[in-house]
Amino acid sequence: PATAPWFPNAPGLTTELLPGGLSGYPYALKALILWAANPLYGIPGLRARIDKNLADPRKLPLIVSVDAFINESNAYADYIVPDSLMYESWGWVAPWNGVPTKALGARWPVIEPKAAKAADGRAIGMENFFIALAKAMGLPGFGADAITDPEGNAYALNTPEEWYLRGGANIAWLGVT
C-alpha cells in the first residue's frame, strides 16, 4: 500500500510533487526546473508544509526557475532564467483540463522580447535555455542535423522557431502516411 496520497483519477495535479520529492517518496528530487510555475502560491498550505526543506540545499541541491516574473516559488531558486511574455514568443495554446474536445492554437511573436540577449543576440527564454542545455549535455535531437525525415533529410534544431516548426509539422502530419 502507498504511504502517501495518490490521486489516480485526478488530471495533472502537482500537489504531491514537491512534498514527495523533498521527502524522497517515491523518488527524491536532485533538481527542480520550474517554467512559469508558482506551486507555492497555487497550492494552499504547501509553503507551510515544505518551506524549510525547499530552502535546504541538502534536500534539493538545485532549483532553476524560467519565468517572466518573480514569484513566491522562484524566490527559492538558485537561478532565475528570464522568459518572454506571450506576445514576444512562439507557443502552442490548448484548453486546460476538463474540456471534452481537442483543440490547439498557435502563437507567434508580434513584438521583440524585452529579455536579456545571449552572446549570439537571441533573447534568453525557455526554449533557448532548454536547447542550449540539451546541446551542452550532448542530448540527441538538438543542434545541426538533429532530426531526420522519412526520406533521410536532416534538419537543425537550434532556435525557438525550429522548435515550434517541428512541433507544428508533427501535428500537421499526424496520421498521414
Regions found by a protein language model. Give the residues of each.
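Short, intrinsically disordered, charge-balanced linker/junction segments flanking boundaries
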Residues: 174-177
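Non-catalytic alpha/beta scaffold blocks inside enzyme catalytic domains
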Residues: 1-166
